[in-house]
A protein has these predicted regions:
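Noncatalytic, basic helical substrate-engagement surface that gates or grips nucleic-acid strands
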Residues: 1-64, 70-94, 169-196
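Hydrophobic alpha-helical scaffolding
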Residues: 14-17, 88, 102, 124-127, ...
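A conserved hydrophobic position in a structured secondary element of the catalytic/binding core
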Residues: 65-66, 139
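Alpha-helix/helix-capping structural signal
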Residues: 68-69, 132
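A short, charged helix-loop
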Residues: 87-120
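Accessory alpha-helical DNA-binding modules that contact the DNA backbone or grooves
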Residues: 105-108, 116-175, 183-186
């Protein structure tokens, strides 16, 4: 585990939910909806790897999720449909929408999490740096790495002190937030064809 506190804030999956998984899998099978799991990999990594493979084959992809982390997968071929209020309100993330909403590109989502943190994933980020400040820094420097290359140019301030003190935390959080797109999947695109009616 790269960051010892990672996932510490997450509650363990409730037993009553775990007990339902076999039934959910059977139900998905009945409807011809494919499912897949890979030991030591998160669902995000499987989705990231499979969407990259689908893009190579020219597919248009829509990822439906309630997890904002997946917006880093947005491309001209991949849209992330983020459920905002259950499934009654859905926000469609494209590169343009992300740029209009936050002023950053999909590749900067992990930089944003590295600087501002993310309470839902227990990423602390840099002390006293919120989303607004992080976005301003990313608009100016592009990436966390580039920001730290120019840290000596910052005027003396509390923010500069926090950035220097929390450099390793920022880089670790960025790394943890990065969805792997090279998971060793044992399935291909043909294996996830919808088989239902």
């Amino acid at each position: 585990e790269k960051y010892s506190d990672y996932k510490a804030g997450r509650k363990k999956t409730p037993e009553e939910l775990s007990e339902q998984f076999p039934y959910v899998k059977k139900l998905l099978d009945c409807y011809g909806i494919k499912h897949y799991e890979l030991k030591n990999y998160e669902a995000d990594d499987i989705i990231g790897t499979m969407s990259k493979e689908a893009e190579k084959h020219g597919y248009e992809i829509t990822i439906v999720t309630g997890d904002r982390d997946l917006t880093q997968l947005v491309t001209n071929q991949t849209t992330v449909a983020l459920t905002v209020k259950g499934v009654t309100e859905i926000e469609y993330y494209t590169p343009n929408h992300l740029s209009e909403k936050l002023g950053i590109s999909p590749s900067q989502i992990t930089d944003l999490k590295g600087l501002a943190g993310d309470a839902s994933d227990n990423y602390p980020g840099v002390s006293k740096v919120g989303e607004k400040t992080a976005l301003k820094l990313l608009n100016q420097y592009g990436t966390i790495e580039n920001l730290y290359e120019h840290i000596d140019e910052f005027k003396k301030s509390k923010m500069k002190e926090h950035l220097i003190e929390d450099k390793e935390i920022a880089l670790t959080c960025k790394n943890l937030a990065t969805i792997r797109r090279d998971a060793p999947l044992e399935i291909g695109l043909a294996d996830i064809d919808f088989a239902g009616k």
